[in-house]
Structures are given as C-alpha cells and as structure tokens.
Amino acid sequence: MQLLKKRILQDGKCYEGGIRIPFIARWPGHVPAGTANDHICAFYDLMPTFCEIIGEKNYVKKYANKNKEVDYFDGISFAPTLLGKKKQKEHDFLYWEFNETNQIGVRMGDWKMVVKKGVPFLYNLATDIHEDNNVADQHPEIVEKMKTIIFAQHTPNPYFSVTLPEKK
C-alpha cells in the first residue's frame, strides 16, 4: 500500500497558502450546481462582479470615495464565469503588497514572483505549486518584467512600507 504525503501550500501572505482560496457561489437558476472552473480572480474583483449582477453600470462614479483625489477600481467582473459564459476578461497580472511581512507578490499566468525584503523569488506554479524551487536565476527576463510591474503598481506609503527589489 502506498501512502500519499499530503503537502500543505506555503503560508505567508504572498505565497499560495496565503492567497489561494476557493470561491464558492450558490445562486439557483443562475449558477449551475456542481460546476467548477480555474478562473483566477482577486478580492478587488468582487465589487465589479456584484455590480454587474445587479445591473449597476456606473459604480465607479457612484461609489468612489469622495475624500480621495483618486479612487481605484482595478477589479474585473467575473460574472460571466459564474454564469457559465465563455467570454471572460482576465487580468494581465495580479499584484499584492503586505507590509506586515515585507512581501510583494506578482502573478502572470503560471509565473509568480514573491519579493521578500527586496529579494525576488520566482516560481512556475504549473510545475511547482508548493513554491519550493526558486527559478529566478534561470529566468531573468521574467524577473525583470515582473519588477517593471512592481515599480508601476507600487504607491509609496509611510504607514505601509515594503522593500522594493533593486532596479536593474
């Protein structure tokens, strides 16, 4: 008898054990029972999804924080996926920052980079879901592309600081 070792995903905010969570929906007559999909979404996709479902087309203007000069709505509705439709817009990348662990995360397709205290670690989630093998040295072009995303997405904040990777 062969015993299978159950492996737990790494925890820590930007690792899969901290961000990979199932989304479960029940909506009789709309969401087909027993369906599953591999659509990747983020917390910030919830508002556009629910607004699309209720028919609110102008939610950015209606719900923007009036106390802010700029309020960001970066989410993409995943209502088409919930409703079983084929056309679903997807993110080019997902981006996270966690100041309490000094981590930044970027995901593009199967590639995921975690920057811990300024040091980049690159993983291919298609072959390494547990994020055991840092392949940053083997794929410097992907690391640089993801660093470009980090520098474009990061907004400095004195209350929530993270250490950015070195610029090339």
Segments (PLM) and residue ranges:
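Conserved nucleotide-sugar donor-binding catalytic segment
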Residues: 20
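Intrinsically disordered, low-complexity polar regions and short flexible loop motifs
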Residues: 128
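A broad, structural surface signal
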Residues: 48, 52, 144, 148-152
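Carbohydrate-binding/catalytic loop surfaces
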Residues: 167-168
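Charge-dense polyanion-binding interfaces
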Residues: 147-164
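Short glycine- and hydrophobic/aromatic-rich loop-to-beta-strand nucleating segment
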Residues: 23-25
